[in-house]
Amino acid sequence: MKRTWIRNALVLGWIPTLGLLLAFAQGPTPVKITRLYTGADGKTKVEEYEIPLKPQGKGTELGQTVAVKSVQFRRTNKDYDLDWHPAPSRQFVVTLSGESEIELEGGRKIRLGPGNILLAEDTTGQGHISRAIGSGDRISLFIPLADGAPSPR
């Protein structure tokens, strides 16, 4: 009985249709940001949020523009391990390939892989530890925010 139902569902196209309905029910892929910032205690904190997007035409959604200074490509190898440090500037760090890990006081670890967007705003205080994960290089983009630019939300 069960096999007949599955066979009929495949023949009639119900399963692909169900998958399509589930995809639409979940909505579009959100743009997620992992933000590091300095708390009142001088220690780095983390929060995650989504950038709101608005429809801009057929198949396109855009967020607000963000004023930035420049774009810098970076490669780090598997030996990269930087002890406690604050971010050198308020900047996006976008991982293109490879993986890294950010460690906060208390041992909390945040893993960053391809497609992850980090907004490093912990420019004062103790900062965080950064290290490579895995056996390959990590390629990333550093995108410093313009002076006085608000944090994108």
Regions found by a protein language model. Give the residues of each.
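Short acidic-glycine-tyrosine-enriched beta hairpin
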Residues: 106-122
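A short hydrophobic beta-strand segment most commonly corresponding to one strand
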Residues: 119-123, 133-150
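Short, conserved beta-strand element in jelly-roll/cupin
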Residues: 77, 85-102
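Short beta-strand segments in beta-sandwich/barrel cores
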Residues: 81-82, 99-103, 117, 148
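Bacterial N-terminal signal peptides
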Residues: 9-23
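A short glycine-rich, His/Asp/Glu-containing loop-to-beta-strand
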Residues: 40-84, 138, 146
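N-terminal secretory signal peptides that target proteins for export/translocation
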Residues: 1-6
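Short beta-strand His + acidic residue motifs that chelate non-heme Fe in jelly-roll/DSBH
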Residues: 83-84, 102-103, 120-121, 126-134
